[in-house]
Amino acid sequence: VFQFLERGDWLWFRPRADGAITRASAMPGVPPELDLSVRAACLLQQAAGIRQGATLRIVKRLPLGGGVGGGSSDAATTLVALNEVWRAGLTLTELAALGLTLGADVPVFVHGHAAWAEGVGEQLTPLELAEPWFVVLVPTCAVATGAVFNDPDLTRNSPPITIADFMAGE
């Protein structure tokens, strides 16, 4: 289940005529070529045949490697925003498909609502959940989501749960 929080990173986009994709703000430990937002901008630019570029400015308010989808939501925001800025004309479904190549949880952020996810994150069923309270803790270490899910020691024998079981509280 993906539940959205009323907290997130702040992103700004400035179009460029020279076709370059650049960051206006440094992110310690994340070179531009590994930044999901930069990668999302480059992916959209290539997929839509866009000649313009963009300067991205990101103020991180969510912890890096904290497991709350900060990088994925930034990538999704980049796809949706630059699709508008560049007038690329892609649908949300097309943007979500592009986002899936960046990370399994990018599509849910492209669609922008709470959802039950199946598959690797691309099969989404919208949910209306009660408005709970959340506490976001900032860990003293960062963990790459991809590394966790690709680790051979990850337990993969959990029984599947259905959306009906989840909604029933089972």
Features from the language model and the residues they span:
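ATP-binding N-lobe of GHMP and related small-molecule kinases
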Residues: 1-65, 84-93, 134, 138-141
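Solvent-exposed alpha-helices and their adjacent loops that cap or buttress functional pockets
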Residues: 3-4, 100-101, 107-110, 126-130
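Conserved, helical-rich catalytic subdomain that frames metal- and/or nucleotide-binding sites
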Residues: 13, 110-111, 116-170
